[in-house]
Design a protein with these regions (language model features):
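Flanking helices and flexible, charged tails adjoining ferredoxin-like Fe-S electron-transfer domains
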Residues: 1-47, 53-54, 63, 71, ...
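Glycine/aspartate-rich loop-and-adjacent alpha/beta segment that forms the canonical ThDP
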Residues: 70-83, 276-371, 376-379, 389-394, ...
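Cofactor-pocket helix-loop regions in the catalytic cores of large enzyme subunits
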Residues: 19-50, 128-187, 192-196, 202
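N-terminal leader/propeptide and maturation segments of large enzyme subunits in energy/redox metabolism
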Residues: 90-164, 365
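Generic, well-ordered alpha-helical scaffold segments in large soluble proteins
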Residues: 39, 44, 48, 52, ...
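C-terminal extensions of enzymes
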Residues: 38, 44-52, 58, 67, ...
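Conserved thiamine diphosphate
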Residues: 17-32, 88-99, 107-123, 178-180, ...
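Thiamine diphosphate
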Residues: 65-66, 75, 165-166, 171-290, ...
Length: 403
């Protein structure tokens, strides 16, 4: 009897903080480290788009907790729909995800072409009505499931004797799983996005295709033992950076904005839930490439207090100016508005306060005298300040009609 009871309809808009939590999560019991900073983001993605998601997951922590044989934390809703998940290697996850996206897109276009041929015939009014509605919102992912279901029902109910129409209907129903617009995602960590898979990632973003990238930024190669990546900030201790990383963190998000037609967002759930929801919703709705970079505290950081405070650490990161919240929306540029929006306020707490609560920074004291540690901390703070000041310049720049 319990299986026959369907969840109640969401009484709120699911792209709001409260409304999103009325949606059934399609990620459960992941087996990740307790308090992991990555899983809350993916859980949220499945609540928003899970019944129509297809995911190419780069190898890394998210592929280990995402599919440790023989189980997977990804599940399905009461209608039997859930994320379609696949894993590829560090070096080709973006290309793999692009292939998944293009394959589904081509099959959907084939179904669309066949449907147009069907409409040229004398078909039922119900088929024409549902087909017209389907075409009208062809690129609308949110409406896609219901419109596709209506179209499938109308085609299945066809009782005419037109042999050609039957042939077209049969061909379309053979492709019915592709009538709905899929939400294509490529998910991976900073080791993949900033380093090993960057060439493929750049290819995907440059393509102009409607595909989404989600980077779980732990600022370290988490799964392979804590090696430094190009995302690791100046001064942090990691494998291959035992004396503290000597150079600045790569600004992957800002690099992506230079294309001009890529939606880019940098988020931290624990710091600003509303901003997180807005950026994710806007990125997915944008008919073009998008990349979201999410700050994810990791057990490798050596957080004093442990991962029980991972969400608080995200808040700390933003309030001290260690991490910044912003987004770049190309649709604003089309209206003559500045596409860069800086959500982070000026730091309200001491930058050093953030560093002092993580072993990856305090371990510097075991290697150097206090004067040297102070110097490294100061350089790290200056690098973060420079980045924030650059974001301010971008957000205040006159653009298009504003000039």
């Amino acid at each position: 009897a319990q299986k026959e009871v369907k969840p109640k309809a969401n009484p709120m808009k699911k792209t709001t903080v409260k409304g999103s939590q009325f949606e059934t999560p399609l990620l459960e019991f992941s087996g990740a480290c307790a308090g992991c900073g990555e899983t809350p983001y993916i859980k949220l993605l499945t609540q928003l788009f899970g019944d129509r998601m297809q995911i190419s997951n780069a190898t890394g922590c998210s592929s280990i907790w995402g599919a440790s044989s023989p189980s997977t934390p990804y599940t399905k809703n009461h209608d039997g729909f859930g994320p379609a998940w696949s894993n590829s290697l560090f070096e080709d996850a973006a290309e793999h995800g692009m292939g998944m996206h293009m394959g589904a897109k081509q099959i959907r276009e084939r179904a669309s072409h066949t449907l147009k041929q069907l409409l040229d015939l004398d078909v039922d009014a119900k088929i024409k009505e549902t087909a017209d509605a389907w075409f009208a919102d062809y690129e609308n992912g949110e409406k896609s499931r219901a419109l596709s279901d209506d179209l499938i029902a109308a085609l299945s109910d066809y009782s005419g004797d037109n042999a050609e129409a039957k042939k077209y209907i049969e061909s379309i129903l053979d492709l019915k799983d592709y009538l709905m617009k899929r939400s294509s995602w490529i998910i991976g960590g900073d080791g993949w996005a900033y380093d090993i898979g960057y060439g493929g990632l750049d290819h995907v973003l440059a393509s102009g295709e409607d595909i989404n990238v989600f980077v779980l930024d732990t600022e370290i190669y988490s799964n392979t033992g804590g090696q430094a990546s190009k995302s690791t900030p100046l001064g942090a201790i990691a494998e291959f950076a035992a004396g503290g990383k000597p150079v600045k963190k790569k600004d992957l998000g800002l690099m992506a904005t230079t294309y001009g037609y890529v939606y880019v967002g940098q988020i931290a759930m624990g710091a600003n839930q509303a901003h997180t929801l807005r950026v994710i919703a806007e990125a997915e709705a944008y008919n073009g490439p998008s990349i979201i970079i999410a700050y994810a505290p990791c057990i490798s950081h050596g957080i004093r207090g442990g991962l029980t405070i991972s969400q608080t650490r995200e808040k700390d990161a933003v309030e001290t100016g260690y991490w910044h919240l912003w987004n770049f929306d190309p649709r604003k540029a089309e209206k003559g508005e500045n596409p860069f929006t800086l959500t982070s306020k000026p730091p309200t707490r001491d930058y050093r306060e953030f560093l002092e609560k993580e072993v990856r920074y305090t371990s510097l004291k075991r290697k150097y005298d206090q004067e040297k540690v102070d110097e490294i901390y100061a350089k790290s703070a200056e690098a973060a300040k420079e980045r924030y000041e650059n974001y301010i310049r971008l957000s205040e720049a006159k653009y298009g009609d504003e000039e």
